C-alpha cells in the first residue's frame, strides 16, 4: 500500500467567491461570468427563449417514448459546458431533460429554497436543445422536477459534469453531489460526476464515464439510499488508466479568512487560501485520480456512525433533575 501523503490540489474544488451583496443581480451575474472566464471555467452559452407561458399552461408536456427518462442537472449553472457534455453523452441511452440552476451554485451543499418562490425559464443550449433554468439551488432544480413540474417520474438522475473534482469530504459541500442525493431522497437512482480542473477542459473522457455509469445503474439498479460519486482525472482521453471502485478519501483543506475594508471603512471577509489537497491512500478516490484512474465511489444517505452508536449505548444518559418551578 502507498503511504498517506498530501496531494497538491487533487482536482481541488476550492470555494468560489460569493457575489458582494450590494451589486445588482445583473451586474453580479456578469462579473461572475467574467471571473469564471479568467479562471478558465468552461462556459457554454444558454440563451433565454422568447415569450412567456400563460398562467396554467406553464407545465411542459413530455410524451413517453419507452426510453429511460433521465434528469440532468448540475451546480455550475445552466451555461456550463460540463452540463452540455453530460446531456449529450446520455442522449444515446435515454430521453434527457436538463433542469439546472440559472447561476453558479458551487459549494451550496443541500440548500433548499423555502422562504421565497422559485421561477423557471426555458433556455436554449449551445446545441440548440431546450433546457430549463431555476433561480435556486441544485436541490431546488431536482425537487421541482420530482414534485410534478413535468408530470412524470424519472428513471435516473445525473448531476454534473462538475468542473473540479468532488473527492472525500468535498461531498459535504458539493451542490453536484447534493443534487444527486435529492434524487435519491425522491426515490430516483442517481449519480454525480466531476472532473479535475483542466487547463484546456475536454469532457470527452468524463462523458464516456457518465455513459458507462448510467448504463450500469439502469441495468443493475441501486438500493434505497444509494448513489454513486464519480471523479475523472484531468488527463487526455487516451491517457487514463481504467476505472477503479473506491472508498471516500480524506480531503485536507487550507482555508484562510481574508479580511478587507470597503471604501466606507467597514470590514468584510472572504474565505480563501491555497487549493485543498488530499491523502492519496490506496483504495481511496484520491489515490485513483492521482494515478489517472476514474474513481467510482458508492455513497449512502444513512450517515449513522456505526462504531460510535455502540459506544454511545454504554454512556450514562441520566438527565439532571428537572428544575423546581413551584412558587
Residue ranges and their predicted role:
Residues 1-24:
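N-terminal acidic, proline/glycine-rich, low-complexity intrinsically disordered segments
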Residues 165-174:
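Glycine/threonine-rich flexible loop motifs
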Residues 73, 99-101, 135, 159-162, ...:
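Short beta-strand segments
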Residues 205-327:
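Electrostatically charged, flexible surface regions
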Residues 145-151, 178-189:
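Alpha-helix C-terminal capping segments
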Residues 184-206:
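Glycine-rich phosphate/pyrophosphate-binding loops
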Residues 156:
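Short, Asp-centered acidic motifs that coordinate Mg2+ and/or phosphate
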Residues 2-3, 25-29, 33-34, 40-73, ...:
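A cross-family phosphate/adenosyl-ligand binding-site feature
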Amino acid at each position: 500500500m502507498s503511504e498517506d501523503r498530501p496531494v497538491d490540489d487533487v482536482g481541488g474544488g476550492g470555494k468560489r467567491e460569493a457575489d458582494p451583496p450590494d451589486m445588482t443581480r445583473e451586474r453580479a451575474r456578469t462579473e461572475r461570468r467574467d471571473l469564471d472566464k479568467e479562471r478558465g471555467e468552461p462556459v457554454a452559452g444558454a440563451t433565454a427563449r422568447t415569450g412567456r407561458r400563460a398562467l396554467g399552461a406553464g407545465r411542459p408536456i413530455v410524451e413517453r417514448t419507452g426510453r429511460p427518462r433521465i434528469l440532468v442537472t448540475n451546480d455550475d449553472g445552466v451555461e456550463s459546458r460540463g452540463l452540455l457534455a453530460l446531456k449529450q453523452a446520455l442522449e444515446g441511452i435515454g430521453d434527457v431533460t436538463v433542469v439546472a440552476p440559472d447561476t453558479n451554485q458551487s459549494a451550496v451543499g443541500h440548500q433548499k429554497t423555502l422562504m421565497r418562490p422559485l421561477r423557471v425559464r426555458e433556455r436554449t443550449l449551445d446545441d440548440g436543445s431546450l433546457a430549463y433554468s431555476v433561480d435556486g439551488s441544485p436541490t431546488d432544480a431536482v425537487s421541482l422536477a420530482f414534485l410534478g413540474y413535468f408530470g412524470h417520474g424519472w428513471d435516473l438522475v445525473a448531476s454534473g459534469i462538475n468542473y473540479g473534482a468532488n473527492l472525500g469530504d468535498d461531498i459535504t459541500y458539493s451542490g453536484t453531489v447534493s443534487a444527486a442525493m435529492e434524487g435519491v431522497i425522491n426515490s430516483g437512482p442517481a449519480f454525480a460526476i466531476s472532473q479535475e480542473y483542466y487547463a484546456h477542459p475536454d469532457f470527452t473522457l468524463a462523458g464516456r464515464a457518465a455513459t458507462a455509469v448510467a448504463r450500469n445503474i439502469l441495468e443493475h439498479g441501486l438500493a434505497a439510499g444509494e448513489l454513486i460519486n464519480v471523479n475523472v482525472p484531468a488527463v487526455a482521453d487516451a491517457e487514463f488508466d481504467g476505472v477503479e471502485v473506491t472508498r471516500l478519501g480524506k480531503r485536507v483543506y487550507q482555508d484562510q479568512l481574508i479580511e478587507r475594508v470597503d471604501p466606507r471603512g467597514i470590514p468584510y471577509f472572504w474565505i480563501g487560501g491555497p487549493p485543498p489537497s488530499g491523502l492519496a491512500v490506496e483504495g481511496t478516490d484520491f489515490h485513483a485520480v492521482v494515478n489517472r484512474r476514474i474513481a467510482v465511489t458508492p455513497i449512502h444517505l444513512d450517515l449513522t456512525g456505526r462504531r460510535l452508536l455502540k459506544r454511545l449505548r454504554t454512556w450514562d444518559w441520566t438527565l439532571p433533575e428537572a428544575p423546581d418551578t413551584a412558587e
